[in-house]
């Protein structure tokens, strides 16, 4: 489902001395259900301008089904920068980390015991799809190929 932006956020809110406006949402507009959360803005976070331009390009791309793959050394700020970008455009995020034992059910959901029977329990990808949250997957390359 395509996103419909409702406001524009100044690039100055991202620490840039630019007059560029970045589409986003009003803070009070989006609600989120667990495990999604709107990350608080860290006013001390400094964006790499080139990285931020790539995020904005992805964010404003017309086809919302296109995933964004970010690579870089451990600790260089990939996850933090994405979370801080989403905080500033007021979008809930569901974050998870893959491992070699990660299975498709960990992502999509599974049937589980519930009140004497069975019920479908949504996984993070399903919750993100239903709620409009961004799904942030760390260490995706560690997941088995079938995931």
Predicted regions and their residues:
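AAA+ P-loop NTPase catalytic core and its hallmark functional loops
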Residues: 2-147
């Amino acid at each position: 489902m395509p996103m419909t932006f409702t406001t524009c956020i100044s690039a100055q809110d991202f620490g840039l001395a630019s007059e560029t406006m970045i589409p986003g949402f009003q803070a009070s507009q989006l609600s989120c259900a667990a495990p999604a959360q709107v990350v608080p803005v860290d006013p001390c976070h400094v964006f790499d301008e080139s990285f931020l331009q790539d995020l904005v390009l992805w964010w404003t791309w017309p086809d919302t089904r296109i995933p964004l793959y970010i690579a870089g050394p451990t600790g260089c700020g990939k996850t933090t920068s994405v979370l801080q970008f989403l905080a500033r455009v007021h979008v809930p995020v569901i974050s998870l980390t893959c491992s070699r034992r990660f299975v498709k059910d960990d992502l999509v959901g599974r049937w589980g015991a519930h009140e004497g029977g069975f019920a479908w329990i949504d996984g993070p990808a399903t919750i993100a799809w239903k709620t409009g949250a961004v799904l942030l997957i760390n260490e995706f390359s560690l997941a088995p190929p079938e995931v």
